[in-house]
Every structure is written in structure tokens, then in C-alpha cells.
Amino acid sequence: MAEHDAPPESGAARSPPAKKRGGDARSPQQDAQPLSSRDRVRERDEDKDRERHRRHGEDRERYRDRESVRERGEGSRDRERHRREHREESRDRERHHREHREGSRDRERHHREHREGSRDRERHHREHREGSRDRERHHRDHREGSRDRERHHRDHRERSERREHRDRSDDRDYRRSCDRDAERRDRDRDGHRRHRSRSPLRSESQSKRMSGFDQRPSEAIPILAPDATPSQLPELPAANPGMFPNMLPNLVNVPALGQPLAMTQQATRHARRVYVGGLPPIANEQTVAVFFNQVMAAIGGNTFALGHAVVNVYINHDKKFAFVEMRSVEEASNAMALDGIMFEGAPVKVRRPTDYNPSQAAALGPSQPNPNLNLAAVGLTPGAGGGLEGPDRIFVGGLPYYFTEAQVRELLETFGPLRGFDIVKDKETGNSKGYAFCLYKDGTVTDIACAALNGIQLGDRTLTVRRANQGAEPRPEQENILLQAQQEAQMKRLVYEVGRTLTTKVVCLTQVVSADDLRDDEEYNDILEDMTLEGHKYVPHSTIAESFIIRPHAKFAIRPKLTEDTNLFHLDLTNHMFSSLPFCHVHVCSY
């Protein structure tokens, strides 16, 4: 095979056939003659040379073919290698682009997390500002209540002074009248005795009698019974001409009761007002007044057949609440049954105002709604509202904003089961406003709970626990246990403080790693370090007391320096750190 692959020798390839020698030239006559053995040998040699020359030509042709095939094969391999290198370069470029895109996504995720952190900080600041506004509103309400009480006391003093002044004036008028009657009788006796004509003084006396100033009416004025209705008013005598000019022109036969009526309205104002909360932004004084007038008429809550139940409406548009002043105490009590009624597509709360005094209101009229009200006419269920009304309703202020409803309930139910509970939340954000209202099933524990919980320090805030109706007085059966309540208050505070020091709360993260990943100590330390560094991105390092992993349960725990920060840690880690891990679970536990 090697012989065929090797190129033929150039000398053998190019050697022409051997020429016949001159002596060997033969004539045609000689050719016709039989060849000799030498000639035959020579011809055979020539044939062999020609055959060898032909084979060499074929070998050269095959060699050229193989060379061309080999060159074509090497070119194909070069092209294949070139294509393979091109594909590898393309893959390298694609991998570079993919890494660049991943880096861009990481940067975008970092920016997004930074923006979310900024929004969280802004939300925290906003909640702090809202809490400040709530505290300011509470102080303002307290100041308004103080001003109302001061105004009430001032009105009471003024009424007392006017009453005393009127009594003194009546005494002076009575003494003057007696003196004038005695003087007139003396003058009459002197005139009859001296037989003199009427003097100017007597004429002056007679003119006084003509004015009717010092004379009793010819008919006694009937006294109105306390329980008389307007339809039972007795017929009064016609007024003398010239008396009380320009006063009550359309009510000739009605006595002047303006000042006592105003005094009565002022005294009953606290019992005739109702608080309406949760108003929609489009509400105004007119729409609220028209709505309550129509609803009161629909349920049969009006005490008078004519006129409207609403006298005045005051709206605080910023806080979305209003004070609605009713015409009578009974109508205000009937309006309490409208708690939860739909107004402009939103349910509203109907409550007593903070200056409502149940003990004083009990003497002015009914304090509960009429049981015969037709609440079904306005889509309400009898007995559904007013679950937190009554003299034993408790106001709980100063709650930390991160306290959940369950935590507040747990704190309050240490004194007994609750009949009603309502934690006030912001309608837009749903976050707690830091105060709540509750009502115990057993009213005898109301003052005990107030005395025990008031003044307790929760985090950076101090609880304010008192009766919601500041004017409400303890029930008679509660007066004997007030001393016991004060003694138990100190014990409650002590138990609560001890419980806080013995309980250690941590934020626990589960389903982050498996138990097999923690078998190796070196891997355990690496995972703990990574988790701790990741946690410090969202939780301030200065507020962390300890971080550890519980083996073999594969639970990563962070213990804050302050127990009150546990809920903040829980919220931050839930919203940020493991949002990309759908199976991770973050919760608060004790150890």
C-alpha cells in the first residue's frame, strides 16, 4: 500500500521508449518476415515499459485524488473547528449577557428593596405622626370636655346668682309694695279726716293703680301641673295692653318662658347629643341633619308629632365625625339604636359623647332606646347595635401601635370575659390608632381593671385606662370593693412586670434550611453567619441581643434586646428578608 501511495520516479515516468538501433532497422520486406527471438524479447520489454508507464500514470492519478480528498477533509475539519470555536464564543457572549442581566436584576432588586425600606420608614413616620395627631385630638377633646364642664359650672353659678338676684328683687318689690300700700292707707285716712280734696299725690297713686303695677289680677292664674302636656295648657287671661311690647307677637296667650327654656336646653345638652363616627368625605351638616330626621321619623323615634328631631349638627371633616344634637333626651336615646346604619354607602357609629353623664341623664329622661322602634324599616336588627354602650364602658389608651387585637384582648381578659371589644383602626391603612374600648360581662370588675391597668408601661408608651364616660360613678355594689381594687392593682403590676422579665420572645424562621445542612459544624457556622448578615440588612444591629440556629430543628432565631421590638422584627423580616422564599415561615415564639 505504501508503494502505491509513493509518487513514481521522475526518471522512469519521463523515459521515452527505447529507440530501435540503426542496425536493427528493418524494411517492410523484413517485417513480413518472421521475428526472431530477440525481436520478440524486445517487443515484450517495450510492452512491459508501456504497461509500467500506464500504471505509473494511474498511480499518479489516484495519488492526486487521495490528496484532493485529504485536502477536502482537512478543510472540512478546519471549518468544523472554526464553527465549534464560533459556537463557543457565542455561548461565552450569551453567558456574559446573562450574567449582566442577572447583575442588573440584582441591582434592580436591591433598589426595589431600598425603596420598600424607604416606604416602610415613611409609613412608620406617618403612623408616628398619626399617633401624635391622635394624642393631640385626645388632649383637645379633654380640653373641650373641661371647657364644657367649666361652662356648665359657670352657667350653674349664673343661674344661681340670677335666682338669688330675682329672689332679692322680689323681696324688695314686695317690701316696696307693702310700704306703698301702708303709705296710701295713711294718706286716705288723713284725707277723710281733714275733708280735703284729692291731692296730686293721691292722683299719682290712682294713676299707678290704673297701670296695674301693684294690683293682683282679677282672676287667679292657674298653675300648670308638672306632668301636663302642651295640649293641656289652661286658658290664660289676655295680656294687658302695653305689657311686654314686641315680645312673642304670635303667642299672645303663652307665658314668657324664654330664659328658663334656654337654661333647660343647656342643662340637658349633654344628654341630647350623640356622636356619629365614620362619616364619608361627602357628608355635610345639611345631609346629616336630613338623613337623621328621615330615619328618626321612619323608625318612630320622634317624641313630638310635628317638627324635626335634629336641632343642630357639628362636623369635623378632618376626623370624619359629627355631633348631632337632638330635640329631646328621649330622641337622643332612640338615636342610639341606629348604630351601624348605612349612610352614603358606609356604616356609621352612633355613640354617646365623652361629656355624657349617665347619673345626671337618668333624671332627665330615658337613657335606653324605645324597645318598640321599627328598626326593620331602615334595615337594622333590634339589639344589634350599642354593644359597647353603658356606664361601665372602658377606654384603653396608650397602646403600642404594633399590638394586635389578640394581644390586647389577652391583656384585658385577665380580669374576666369581655362582653364587647373594639380596637380603633385607621380606615385607610388598617393600622391601630393606639386606643380601644371594651366592656366586661361582669360590671363589678370595671374599676378593678381600670385601677390595675392604668399607668402600666408598655414599651415606650404608658397605658391610660379609665371609664369612657368620665362622669359615670361606680355602682353601689362596687363601692365596697374599690379598696380591694387598689390593693390588687399593685399585685397586678408586680405580676405583669415579673412576667415580662421571665418571658423571652424571639423571631423564629423555619423552612429556610434543612436539618441535613446543619450536620456539619463548619457548614452550620457558615449558614449562621450568612443568616445573621442577611438579617442585619433589615433589623438594626444595635437592637439584636443574640442570633442562633436551633439544631436539629433547623430554626433560625433572632432575640432582640427589648421584648417590645419582637413584633417590629417580625414585620420587617416578613416583608423584606424572605419575600423570595415562598416556603419560609416567620413567627414569634418563646424559649
UniProtKB/Swiss-Prot annotation:
Bias (Basic and acidic residues): 37-79, 157-191
CDD domains from the UniProt entry: RRM1_U2AF65, RRM2_U2AF65
GO molecular function annotations of the record: poly-pyrimidine tract binding; pre-mRNA 3'-splice site binding
Listed Polar residues bias regions: 27-36
Coiled coil start-end: none
A Pfam entry, by short name: RRM_1
Region (Disordered): 1-215
Subcellular location: Nucleus
Domain RRM: residue ranges: 272-355, 392-470
Keywords, alphabetical: mRNA processing, mRNA splicing, Nucleus, Repeat, RNA-binding
Keyword Nucleus: yes
Protein family (similarity comment): Belongs to the splicing factor SR family.
Note on domains (UniProt): N-terminal RS domain has a very strong bias in favor of D over S.
Function in brief: Necessary for the splicing of pre-mRNA.
Database matches in PANTHER family: RNA-BINDING PROTEIN (PTHR23139)
Protein name: Splicing factor U2af large subunit A
Taxonomic source organism: Triticum aestivum
